[in-house]
């Protein structure tokens, strides 16, 4: 099983002082290296107007790459692809794929509603529907497949358009393009990802994990992809948004989880009070409830596990038995706050006591990512 950890979790700045940005960036860098040295693949968010390093996560990852062990992957959870010009996005992904020899996992999706699409000039309705993400991904596939001699490739998606006559440079290291992990919350999206040969995020934000995993496996079995493509899909099929707290006893872990959640919600509430509503990655909990309201109430922290290493390992075993091979972990606790020790202890205990029980042999180089078209 593969284990990834999110740098600084869903960071919200405790204060909005530009003079503090460098300290936070250095903190995120140090934590990324520390997590990788503990044994985790490191992941970064892609957000705007709410944190000093994840407004350009690919540039941040390019700096991190040579500083972490060579067998670690980096990932993005997720790149908000409607916010990018498709040509620039494919160029950046290809270059990072080349620099890391394929050791980057590009989670892709729509991103958040509200401030971000408004600030980036993206139509909020088209963005919220998910249509722009699908259209952008279609254009990206066309760009990856374009070669010399092909007819001119023109496209228009959202506010972005282009016309190319030459291939995208550099080409990706992986074939036919870098490893994509697709956010798919609906059945149609899960089936489409399997048909494309893409891993997916399953169980996102309270969805039925077992049901989604069974659907994905059935859809993957019905494809004609080579076995190595199917294996790669299952290797990186990811259970996302798992909040983890590990301690010496179950009781202590549950108490620490409460403390960590309380500080996160206090910081989030303060930010909302100062800057207005903040949309987040949560589905509407009740009819008529906005994502901003749900996020303000902690709707993104429903999937949590807390306990001793043995308790945590038992829960991980249940997930492994469902066919989950990649856990995307968020160790609860504010790294820039009073509950940093909770995050630190959890990550260290998990790495020492849980991770070795599910270790798998790492390939000397990542398998080429190939999908049938």
Report each predicted region and the residues it spans.
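Hydrophobic faces of well-ordered beta-strands that scaffold small-molecule active sites
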Residues: 3-7, 42-45, 72-77, 104-108, ...
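Conserved, mostly hydrophobic/aromatic
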Residues: 3, 35, 47, 64, ...
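Alpha-helix-loop-beta-strand connector modules within alpha/beta enzyme cores
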Residues: 54-76, 132, 344-364
């Amino acid at each position: 099983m593969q284990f990834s950890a999110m740098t600084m979790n869903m960071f919200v700045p405790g204060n909005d002082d530009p003079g503090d940005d460098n300290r936070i960036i250095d903190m995120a860098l140090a934590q990324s290296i520390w997590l990788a040295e503990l044994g985790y693949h490191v992941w970064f968010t892609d957000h705007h107007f709410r944190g000093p390093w994840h407004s350009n996560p690919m540039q941040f990852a390019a700096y991190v790459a040579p500083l972490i062990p060579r067998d670690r992957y980096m990932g993005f959870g997720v790149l908000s692809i409607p916010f990018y010009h498709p040509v620039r996005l494919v160029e950046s992904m290809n270059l990072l794929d080349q620099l890391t020899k394929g050791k980057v996992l590009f989670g892709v999706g729509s991103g958040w509603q509200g401030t971000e699409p408004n600030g980036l000039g993206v139509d909020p309705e088209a963005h919220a529907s998910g249509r722009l993400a699908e259209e952008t991904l279609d254009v990206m596939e066309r760009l990856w497949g374009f070669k010399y001699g092909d007819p001119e490739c023109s496209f228009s998606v959202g506010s972005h358009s282009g016309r190319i006559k030459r291939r995208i440079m550099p080409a990706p290291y992986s074939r036919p393009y870098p490893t994509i992990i697709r956010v798919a919350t609906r059945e149609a999206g899960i089936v489409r990802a399997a048909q494309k040969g893409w891993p997916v995020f399953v169980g996102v934000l309270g969805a039925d994990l077992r049901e989604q995993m069974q659907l994905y496996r059935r859809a993957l079995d019905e494809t004609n992809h080579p076995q190595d493509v199917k294996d790669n899909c299952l290797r990186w099929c990811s259970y996302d948004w798992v909040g983890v707290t590990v301690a010496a006893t179950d009781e202590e872990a549950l108490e620490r989880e409460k403390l960590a959640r309380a500080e996160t919600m206090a910081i989030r509430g303060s930010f909302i009070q100062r800057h207005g509503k903040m949309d987040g990655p949560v589905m509407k909990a009740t009819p008529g409830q906005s994502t901003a309201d749900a996020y303000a109430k902690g709707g993104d922290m429903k999937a949590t596990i807390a306990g001793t290493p043995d308790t945590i390992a038992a829960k991980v075993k249940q997930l492994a038995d469902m066919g989950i091979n990649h856990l995307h972990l968020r160790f609860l606790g504010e790294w820039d706050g009073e509950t940093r020790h909770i995050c630190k202890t959890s990550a260290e205990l998990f790495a020492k006591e849980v991770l070795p029980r599910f270790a798998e042999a790492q390939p000397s180089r990542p398998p080429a990512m190939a999908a049938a078209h």
